[in-house]
Amino acid sequence: VTKAALPALKKSKGRVITIASAAAIGRTAYNWLPYVAAKSALLAMSKNLAQELGPHGVTVNSISPSMVDTDLVSNIPERMRQMTVSRTPLRRLATADDVAGAALMLASPYASFITGENMLVTGGEHMI
């Protein structure tokens, strides 16, 4: 999709925002290799795109949320959900609105000098 949008992005000095995962930067659960590999590749792609598109005024950033309280995680055992909450200083899971807020900020004029970054939306669970 990004490749198809390149001419318009360059012309408009647009924004590319990818949604990765905090799982790509920290310890993960057993059997998550395909998911973590894909999200890690997305982070690398975003940084490379930031280098390539920066001279055209296009910013490229990633958002890496921790566990987001959606239907997608409803099948995760409650014990695992609570373990995540207990490791998070804000003592809750992320919401879709938390992730959307990060995207709105990165898409806004206030983020015009932010590129090649990975914004963690983890409630402090993955402080670096």
Q: What would you call each of these model-derived segments?
A:
Residues 25, 60, 64-75:
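Short, flexible catalytic-loop segment of classical short-chain dehydrogenase/reductase
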Residues 21:
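Residue(s) in the substrate-gating loop at a strand-loop-helix junction
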Residues 26, 104, 115-128:
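Short C-terminal tail/terminal secondary-structure segment
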Residues 88-99:
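A conserved structural motif in NAD(P)-dependent oxidoreductases
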Residues 28-36, 48:
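Active-site loop-to-helix junction immediately N-terminal to the catalytic Tyr of the SDR YXXXK motif
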Residues 7, 51-55, 112:
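Alpha-helical segment proximal to the catalytic Tyr-Lys
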Residues 2, 38, 46:
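Active-site helix of classical SDR
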Residues 13, 54, 59, 114-116:
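Short, small/polar-rich loop/turn modules that mediate ligand/substrate recognition or access, typified
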